[in-house]
């Protein structure tokens, strides 16, 4: 991973900071919609720092610069940041958060600047309080992004790809029904409206899909839903006649994307004016998501006029319709078949044919095999194809032309996924094509045991992913081992591969939302030896109600249904470490994989032989 000399970029940025009288400037990773994955034109933190990971925040003062990121990216950030930068390893003891570091730098009456469209209103409020307590001046909303000024004419144009309709038979629910349910939420809160800013929520709400952000079938847009009107803010050039007809049939108005702030101000003025009327019924505040930007909150009137809530659209989206669940099961079988073909091909090339393949060449083959499956649209994220020590970099990204050659005598980790019209996939398998060490086999088996434990979990309704996280880590913990990432994330239906608000892990938000039937999320424990190897095993699971002998407190009990259909690496399993119950689970899983996928391999002797060996009975 090459370092970029950021000296001139930082010098230029500091010049613009001085012009606006800010001594500290914050550059988040997200775009104006709080997206995790962003378009190239919004990669501001990457441009100023040289760090390409998907999560992190840069903070620049007139003398220093710091980059904060989490444990998934410690190795990558250390490799990519040049000497201008200090790495803040979030989550480690005595390491300040980027908010704390920003506030510390503001002491002595310094101003802290930020683009108000890139942080949430809640974050801005908390940060302003920290700045005040640290002796700083204030948090200043800087209209016009300063990194964009540094970037200049080299900044990529904003994408404007066409939008398509997601048919009701795949979505499982009409736009009209979704809007009716949202308006019922507004009525409960006596709210005059909800502003939707998350791109995947808008795509889901209006049964549309786009292609503005790589790997994520979303499109740049906002929406405002009131008791009477639903308005989609989108560039008109994105819509064809079919989309316009679809929106019209569902009584959705269309307005220009760039008019959202003006309309938000007008809405605030209108609601305020109505509230002054003697005969007006009392109303609550306008609603925005707690991930909605500070700019949107300010336009709607600020704290006194706006309530920031967990998005009811996001909550509804996380509980998949029956049609979406049917699609998720089906696409994971097709996707599993592609992965089985890939792993069989890769082993044949490396071991039998003694071929030389680098990480990207292998990933290209996997994409080719996936593209041959029905309803394939594209990848759901860049394939993590990693050999040996590269596998220890949790979100490693091989670079074409300069990546490593796959070593058959080292661990190979492949984390990959695809977008299909009927669902989104995300699967990780760790393999070894030679002779693994005892330490590697032990670590792999401990990870597998945690993976199985979570898959078999049964828990009462109301349980959160926060409460389940330890199940996946327990066998690692018993041996003094652990991993620095979450155990599970929500997955969209032909939408973002990372989807909130649910998840399994130690993040605070995972303790706030209980898992519910219809949730789709990942089960992906791991273990990483820096500079040596990495192990991760990932399946996608569906939350469902489980029949139990008793029902304590008259509560239903829930569990998981795995939909991923790919064998585990037989070469890395130390069966002596497995209990009889775990072996039984593994045999049942393997039998299901064979039953669901073998029909794809007629006449493919290499794949059939590989599948037979990898799914052989564990005694």
Curated annotation (Swiss-Prot):
Cofactor note: Binds 2 manganese ions per subunit.
SUPFAM superfamilies noted in UniProt: Creatinase/aminopeptidase, Creatinase/prolidase N-terminal domain
Record bears the keyword Transcription regulation: no
Catalysed reaction equations from the record: Release of any N-terminal amino acid, including proline, that is linked to proline, even from a dipeptide or tripeptide
EC number: 3.4.11.9
Keyword field: Aminopeptidase, Hydrolase, Manganese, Metal-binding, Metalloprotease, Protease
Cofactors (names): Mn(2+)
Binding site for Mn(2+) 1: 426, 524, 538
Classification via Gene3D superfamilies: Creatinase/methionine aminopeptidase superfamily, Creatinase/prolidase N-terminal domain
Pfam families given in the database record: Creatinase_N, Creatinase_N_2, Peptidase_M24, Peptidase_M24_C
GO biological process, one term: proteolysis
GO MF, one annotated term: metalloaminopeptidase activity
Enzyme class: hydrolase
Superkingdom, natural source: Eukaryota
GO cellular component terms attached to this protein's record: cytoplasm
Record function comment: Catalyzes the removal of a penultimate prolyl residue from the N-termini of peptides.
Protein name: Probable Xaa-Pro aminopeptidase P
Organism name: Fusarium vanettenii (strain ATCC MYA-4622 / CBS 123669 / FGSC 9596 / NRRL 45880 / 77-13-4)
């Amino acid at each position: 991973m090459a370092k970029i000399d950021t000296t001139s970029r930082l010098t230029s940025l500091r010049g613009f900071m001085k012009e606006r009288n800010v001594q500290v400037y914050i550059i988040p990773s997200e775009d104006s919609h709080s997206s995790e994955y962003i378009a190239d034109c919004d990669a501001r933190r990457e441009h100023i720092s040289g760090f390409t990971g998907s999560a992190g925040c840069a903070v620049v003062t007139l003398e220093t610069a710091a980059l904060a990121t989490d444990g998934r990216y410690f190795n990558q950030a250390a490799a990519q940041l040049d000497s201008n930068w200090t790495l803040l390893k979030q989550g480690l003891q005595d390491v300040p958060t980027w908010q704390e570091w920003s506030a510390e730098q503001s002491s002595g009456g310094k101003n802290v600047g930020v683009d108000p469209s890139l942080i949430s209103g809640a974050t801005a409020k908390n940060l302003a309080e920290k700045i005040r307590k640290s002796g700083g001046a204030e948090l200043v909303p800087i209209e016009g992004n300063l990194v964009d000024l540094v970037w200049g004419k080299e900044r990529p144009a904003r994408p404007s790809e066409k939008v398509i309709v997601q048919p009701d038979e795949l979505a499982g629910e009409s736009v009209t029904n979704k809007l009716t349910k949202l308006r019922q939420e507004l009525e409960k809160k006596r709210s005059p409206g909800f502003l939707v800013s998350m791109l995947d929520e808008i795509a889901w709400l209006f049964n549309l899909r786009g292609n503005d952000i790589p790997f994520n079938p979303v499109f740049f847009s906002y929406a405002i839903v009131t008791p009477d009107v639903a308005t989609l803010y989108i560039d008109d050039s994105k819509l064809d006649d079919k989309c316009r007809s679809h929106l019209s049939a569902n009584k959705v108005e269309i307005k220009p994307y760039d008019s959202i702030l003006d309309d938000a101000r007008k809405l605030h003025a209108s609601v305020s004016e109505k509230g002054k009327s003697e005969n007006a019924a009392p109303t609550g505040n306008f609603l925005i998501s707690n991930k909605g930007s500070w700019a949107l909150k300010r336009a709607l009137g600020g704290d006194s006029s706006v309530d920031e809530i967990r998005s009811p659209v996001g909550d509804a989206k996380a509980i998949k319709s029956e049609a979406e669940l049917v699609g998720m099961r089906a696409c994971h079988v097709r996707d599993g078949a592609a992965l089985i073909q890939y792993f069989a091909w890769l082993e044949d090339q490396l071991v039998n044919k003694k071929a030389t393949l680098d990480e990207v060449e292998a990933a290209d083959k996997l994409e080719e095999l996936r593209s041959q499956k029905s309803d394939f649209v594209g990848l759901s994220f860049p394939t993590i194809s990693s050999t040996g020590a590269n596998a220890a970099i949790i979100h490693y990204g091989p670079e074409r032309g300069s990546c490593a050659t796959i070593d058959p005598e080292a661990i190979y980790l492949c984390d990959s996924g695809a977008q299909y019209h009927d669902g989104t996939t995300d699967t990780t398998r760790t393999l070894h094509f030679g002779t693994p060490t005892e330490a590697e086999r032990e670590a792999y088996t401990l990870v597998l045991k945690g993976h199985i434990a979570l898959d078999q979990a049964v828990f009462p309704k109301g349980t959160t992913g926060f409460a389940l996280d330890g199940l996946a880590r327990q066998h690692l913990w018993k041996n003094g081992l652990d991993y620095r990432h979450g155990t599970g994330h929500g997955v969209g239906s032909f939408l973002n591969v990372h989807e909130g608000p649910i998840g399994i892990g130690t993040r605070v938000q995972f303790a706030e939302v209980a898992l519910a039937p219809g949730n789709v999320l990942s089960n992906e424990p791991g273990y990483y030896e820096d500079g040596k190897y990495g192990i991760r095993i990932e399946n996608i699971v569906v939350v469902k109600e489980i029949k139990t002998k008793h029902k304590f407190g008259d509560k239903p009990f829930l569990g998981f249904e795995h939909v991923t259909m790919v064998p585990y690496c037989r070469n890395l399993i130390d069966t002596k470490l497995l209990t009889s119950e775990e072996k039984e689970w593994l045999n049942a899983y393997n039998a299901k994989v064979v039953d669901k996928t073998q029909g794809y391999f007629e006449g493919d002797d290499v794949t059939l032989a590989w599948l037979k060996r990898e799914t052989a009975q564990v005694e």
